[in-house]
Amino acid sequence: MGAATETFYSVIRRQGITRRSFHKFCSLTATSLGLGPLAASRIANALETKPRVPVIWMHGLECTCCSESFIRSAHPLVKDAVLSMISLDYDDTIMAAAGHQAEAILEETRAKHKGQYILAVEGNPPLNEGGMFCIDGGKPFVEKLKMMAEDAMAIIAWGACASWGCVQAAKPNPTQATPIDKVITNKPIIKVPGCPPIAEVMTGVVTFITTFGKLPELDRQGRPKMFYSQRIHDKCYRRPHFDAGQFVEEWDDEAARKGYCLYKMGCKGPTTYNACSTVRWNGGVSFPIQSGHGCIGCSEDGFWDKGSFYDRLTNIKQFGIEKNADQIGMVAAGAVGAAVAAHAAVTAVKRLATKREDADHNS
């Protein structure tokens, strides 16, 4: 049986993994995808019966941060995803082959799995001067991308570079760096933005496709809803401070040490859709806001050209912002003071009434 036609289960059994451990893996995977424990049996059945999905991973203009993130996935571990769940037949960054040998593997994979492989793209193609600003295997990357996209089942655009253009496309964009969906228009494309995306988001998308044999539900921008349906602000652990009007005014002030909201320091959490505040990074250990720095909005289109990362958002309409953040703390303090005064007044009235009742009773 060929490497790509083996199932995930047959591979892990050959590696000495017990069935109990396999079902534990399926349960953890279902939970990490937000599907609940009932989906574990479906995942187990799929991984037992479906052949591993062949994947071709290509690199355009990028810094490889998406690959760096991917290899740090904890749920599932990247070794399980790469060595067992999928058949990663080509990735010129981590594969042993190089040069003509690597190109031969690419052509062989394309011919052998025509219409069945997933094309994962990290980075983007520059279109200016015939694509000569990015050469891969002696050809402009854009030509290679179009050729491999023709026979792909689906395309995954990893990171902000492939999804939106990112810093390579920053104005005036001399190389004409272009997002994947602007070049390939006849194939389904899953955008997984971020600079880089969260590791578990990347492996989660791969796991979903492998398990259910279809693409995850996408939003209107082409992002998987399971990871990009909520703003970071919605689940941020500092949200109560935002609602209470408690903001960091400058780095290392008392409010910063107390963990108050970073909105005034330029945090883009209120306008950024991602899973950072729920999935978090490094196996769920932390995320930028938790480490004391505001969100820079790296999963949103055009974040690199929207001014300083430390400029406060001014066009947000929601509780806590539309009233002017400078006044919220004063208003909140006033409200608390009024509540305390009202409570004291009510208590005094009750005590006075009690004394009168006692006096009437004694007389």
From Swiss-Prot:
This enzyme's EC code(s): 1.12.99.6
Q: Quick one: a GO cellular component term?
A: [Ni-Fe] hydrogenase complex
Tell me one GO molecular function of this protein.
Answer: ferredoxin hydrogenase activity
For this protein, the record's InterPro entries field holds: Cytochrome-c3_hydrogenase_C, NADH_UbQ_OxRdtase-like_20kDa, NiFe-Hase_small_C_sf, NiFe_Hase_small_N_sf, NiFe_hydrogenase_ssu, TAT_signal, TAT_signal_bac_arc
Can you cite a GO biological process for this protein?
Answer: anaerobic respiration
Report the main location listed first in the record.
Answer: membrane
Q: Which UniProt key words apply to this protein?
A: 3Fe-4S, 4Fe-4S, Cell membrane, Iron, Iron-sulfur, Membrane, Metal-binding, Oxidoreductase, Signal
Q: Which chain positions lie within coiled-coil regions?
A: none
Provide the protein name. Uptake hydrogenase small subunit
Tell me what organism the protein belongs to.
Bradyrhizobium diazoefficiens (strain JCM 10833 / BCRC 13528 / IAM 13628 / NBRC 14792 / USDA 110)
Q: Which gene encodes it?
A: hupA
